[in-house]
Structure formats: structure tokens, C-alpha cells
Amino acid sequence: MALSQYLFGIKGEDIACEYLKNKDFEILERNFHSKFGEIDIIAKKDKILHFIEVKSTQGNYEVAYRLDGKKYNKIIKTIEYYFMKHKSNENFQLDLLCVYKDDIKLLENISY
């Protein structure tokens, strides 16, 4: 991955965190890693853990389509690892936050 792509992704995650904070989410962790993959943001709101995948674009295409089945399965395995590591049984959901040029969309409780 080129440095410019990496920095663009970080900027998208920064924008996502600010958006979530403004919507009363508490940011618990960023870039949680396991051997299976990474979760961009782990946040909490109303006693529910939100595992949030952030996708950003400068183009004119639907960024949500960049979350494919392979990536989805890696995220699910990483969520399972998170619960094993933290010995938690909290309610949770997987969300997709799309950052467009001048728009942000939060798609909650997604499945594939």
C-alpha cells in the first residue's frame, strides 16, 4: 500500500471518530489487530459495542461495495478474538461507516 493511500485511510478514520463522538459514541479503541485482521474502530453507545469498519473514497463510486465477503469474515473472526481476549459478553454489532468527499454515512448492524 502506498503511503498516500495509508494516510488517506488514517484521515478517513479520524473523520469517522469525530463523527461518532458527535453522535455520542465513546471511542474505546482504534486499529484493533488480531492474526485474522483489523477492526478500525471499537466504540460504545447505549451499552452496545460497535465494531466499525471505515471505508473512504474520493471517487464517485459506492464505497460500501469495498467490503466483500472475505473482509467481512476476517472482521467477524477478529471480533471473536476481541471477546476472547477481553472476556466480555456484551451486546455488539458490526457497522460500516462510509466517508465520501463531503458526506458520511453510518450503516448499522450490517451482515453479509
Swiss-Prot record:
It holds the Pfam family UPF0102. InterPro entries: Restrct_endonuc-II-like, tRNA_endonuc-like_dom_sf, UPF0102_YraN-like. Disulfide bonds: none annotated. GO terms for molecular function: nucleic acid binding. SUPFAM superfamilies: Restriction endonuclease-like (SSF52980). NCBIfam families: PRK12497.2-4. HAMAP family: UPF0102. Belongs to the UPF0102 family. This is UPF0102 protein Cla_1413.
